[in-house]
């Protein structure tokens, strides 16, 4: 392995939205925040639960709302 070309690898704290925290190795210089981890993911827990995707949907709608409004023709508004 070449010297001085790889980023430093260190321990960082990972925090999930469920409150679970753990340490892992990474090249990041900051803490990492997750929406889902193995402690709350339905596959690992064996429980059915709804995963909140509303945040992603709303972000998508906001992003493309301006394009949709700009491209709307008068015929679209009549329908």
Swiss-Prot record:
GO terms for molecular function: metal ion binding; rRNA binding; structural constituent of ribosome. Keywords: Metal-binding, Ribonucleoprotein, Ribosomal protein, RNA-binding, rRNA-binding, Zinc. InterPro entries: Ribosomal_bL28/bL31-like_sf, Ribosomal_bL31, Ribosomal_bL31_A, Ribosomal_bL31_sf. GO terms for biological process: translation. HAMAP family: Ribosomal_bL31_1. Part of the 50S ribosomal subunit. Binds the 23S rRNA. This is Large ribosomal subunit protein bL31.
